[in-house]
Regions:
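Class I S-adenosyl-L-methionine
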Residues: 1-15, 19-175
């Protein structure tokens, strides 16, 4: 089976520097941080999303896990088993897109679990890499205020469409 090809992510060809996030001096969860861990403060706090079905043979095309660094006080390493492998998917299908549209797309159900563990209702959640909009939908479901940014107009439109479909609302452009 050949892997799906996604639209390239703008600026993904440049080295990532998380310094700006750290300068915000706020509680952070940074996905993919294992790829630039040397640029982050040491932390015993990592989230591990285990996304393969138990007992399934390794598929060299995809990682069995995704890692996220966190600096949230009082929380140590935490494993989140949440099936997301090809057609095999866990959770409420009404919350998810019918197919993946972004190469680093996260399932809404996984993000709901993480938001419930690491934040409270009415908290402000900042996602500077909106991608497919999963964080926005998870915030809608858990009564968090989501502030999201996405550089690529293509993915911005996916996020807007997804939010409008999910909420029945109409996005308003603010100048």
């Amino acid at each position: 089976m050949q892997a799906k090809r996604y639209k390239p992510i703008l600026n993904d060809d440049k080295p990532y520097d998380p310094t700006i996030l750290l300068e915000l001096n706020v509680n952070s969860i940074i996905w993919g941080a294992n790829n630039f861990a040397s640029k982050l403060p040491d932390s015993p706090k990592w989230l591990v999303w285990y996304k393969k079905p138990m007992g399934k043979a390794n598929d060299d095309n995809f990682s069995d896990v995704e890692l996220a660094w966190t600096n949230i006080k009082g929380k140590m390493c935490k494993m989140y088993p949440y099936l997301w492998s090809g057609l095999l998917r866990e959770g409420n299908r009404d919350l998810e897109l019918k197919e993946r549209v972004h190469p680093t797309q996260k399932p809404v159900g996984l993000l709901i679990n993480i938001l419930n563990d690491y934040s409270n209702p009415n908290d402000n959640i900042l996602d500077l890499y909106g991608g497919s909009g999963s964080t926005l939908i998870a915030c809608e479901e858990t009564n968090r205020n989501c502030y999201m940014m996405e550089l690529d107009p293509y993915y911005c439109q996916i996020i807007i469409n997804r939010w409008e479909t999910f909420t029945g609302g109409k996005a308003v452009k603010i100048n």
